[in-house]
Amino acid sequence: MRTSDETRKAHASYALYDAGGRVEASGVADAAAGDEAFTVGSVALDWLDADGLRAADHAVTLDRWPSGRLVVSQLGRRFETFAAAVREARDRARVSGFLAHGLDDPLPFTGAVLEPAPVREARLLLYATHLTVVPKEDDPFQVPYGAVAELRPDAARHALALETAGGAIVLGHVARDTDAFHSALRTRRDAQAKRLADLTGETVFADGQGVARSALHRIDELLRAFAAPERAAGLAALLDPADPPEAVRFGFVELLDLDERLAPAARELPEHFASFLLVPVRGRVILEILAGPSAATYVFEGDIEEINRDLQALRFRRRPLALSGKEAELTPSNPYRLALRKLPALQRLRAAIRARLNHGSGWEAALAKALDGPVG
């Protein structure tokens, strides 16, 4: 629940320090924790640049990226409520900055990350598509439901372990809301899986996780059913160079950055869903969105499992991937600057891009050229 406007304001002393500890600005003024920035006196600190937050000794300290800090003090009786409002506003903005928000309002819980260590208090936000964890003294991160292979109750610690390819994430300290949290998380994950099973008649699909041809005997039928006509025409150019062919992956993802849809596939996709193809080719991986949004063809360098995992963690968001070098500069006006400098999946994927090919005349020749030559 968003805190009220009144709790987000306070009269306070402030001092803005540079990296060397020298005061850049100071005074006594009205402070406000806005939706996009913290403001006090002549200072405005965007939440995307507020990399640290500490509330102690009746002062709120915000670390400023790339250097410096803002200290707000003399809050009196307003300290605790104002500090909580600052934290809530910062968390909300940075969840979006880390691309960990959803299309719906989340169901919130208060708990802790027990593993991986160290134990950290955290807000647990359940969206329709994923869980976002917001540790009190760390950066938020998301866990797509499709990445959770198993939900394992830990009765001894009144906790829940989320088994993923990257290891277990154990969440607990939810107190009397433990059963409600476990039930809500399981319900959302199962609902998403059921939607894909009902769509395809297969139980192997998970949101954002491609299924290998070797595990999906109906892959050719499903490709024809869930590719838009203009993408189906290019399937041969995508599949013929596959090496090894059995490692080709097909899957579905529920998108969070919406776009105009292509002509519908032979079998209609649920709202906000896209179908995708991942093709390994001698150390490279082709990504093709077969139906859903308008999207270019990407060629990455790397392992198909790692590329798929990072795309899933990014929820196949195309806009931050498509940024040019100029557009990706970490300027104050760049809405992706926090993700670009601190989100590992996005950093790895951008570093792995070898080609981004728009569909149209010359697409097939450009794809063949992108797949040619040595890797590395």
Which role does the model predict for each range below?
Residues 1-16, 49-115, 146-376:
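Acidic, Ser/Thr- and proline-rich intrinsically disordered linker/docking segments
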Residues 32-39, 60, 131-132, 158-160, ...:
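Hydrophobic residues embedded in beta-strands of well-ordered beta-sheets
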Residues 35-45, 129-142:
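Short aromatic-glycine motifs in intrinsically disordered, low-complexity regions
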Residues 20-21, 28, 35, 243-245:
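N-terminal targeting and processing segments
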Residues 120-126, 144-145, 149-153:
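Internal, hydrophobic cores of structured domains that mediate oligomerization or house catalytic pockets
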Residues 22-28, 68-71, 121, 140, ...:
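Short, mixed charged/polar active-site loops
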Residues 25-33, 38, 119-132:
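Polybasic phosphoinositide-binding surfaces of eukaryotic membrane-targeting domains
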Residues 12-22, 35, 139:
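Low-complexity, Gly/Pro
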